């Protein structure tokens, strides 16, 4: 679970490190905090009962961690909510680890959350991880222009992702549902 100035951003030009996607160099987590709308995602097991787009809210904590609240609507109209936390995995803030559940109720299970592309004004974010099994395009607004979405898919392609794997929810018109 759970982010429009240039059509091709620096993230698209960095390439790959050891065959893995390359996160942006740094992220100001205070600016990153807040509400994000899911524009597109690679379908995954923990969102398989969500219909349409989800939202993610990130709130900074005093201990340096981040509270994560993901919400989506289920087919029956109910809101599904998942609460978790994130912690920094690097000094630049672009590599985080998130946990939404624990083993035996006390040992968290952490997953990678890498910010691969980020708008200069923090108006969009592209999130992924090393295996490319998971990926999201997030925006500060519920929709995104088709041209911006296509540029973000190009950024993902340059990072080794296949845009056709993405399910699109918040595109303006023409790109909706295309993922390519």
Task: Give the predicted meaning of each segment.
Residues 8-180:
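A beta-rich soluble binding module of mature secreted/lumenal proteins
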């Amino acid at each position: 679970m759970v982010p429009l100035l240039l059509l091709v951003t620096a993230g698209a030009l960095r390439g790959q490190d050891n065959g893995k996607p390359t996160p942006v160099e740094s992220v100001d987590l205070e600016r990153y905090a807040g509400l994000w709308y899911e524009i597109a995602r690679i379908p995954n097991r923990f969102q398989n009962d969500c219909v349409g787009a989800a939202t993610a809210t990130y709130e900074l904590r005093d201990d340096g961690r981040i509270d994560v609240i993901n919400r989506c609507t289920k087919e029956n109209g109910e809101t599904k909510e998942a609460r978790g936390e994130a912690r920094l995995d690097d000094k630049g803030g672009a590599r985080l680890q998130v946990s939404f559940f624990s083993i035996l109720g006390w040992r968290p299970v952490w997953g990678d959350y890498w910010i691969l592309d980020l708008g200069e004004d923090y108006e969009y974010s592209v999130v992924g991880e090393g295996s490319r099994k998971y990926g999201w395009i997030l925006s500060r607004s519920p929709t995104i222009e088709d041209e911006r979405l296509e540029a973000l898919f190009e950024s993902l392609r340059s990072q080794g992702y296949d845009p056709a794997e993405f399910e699109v929810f918040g595109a303006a018109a023409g790109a909706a549902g295309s993922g390519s």
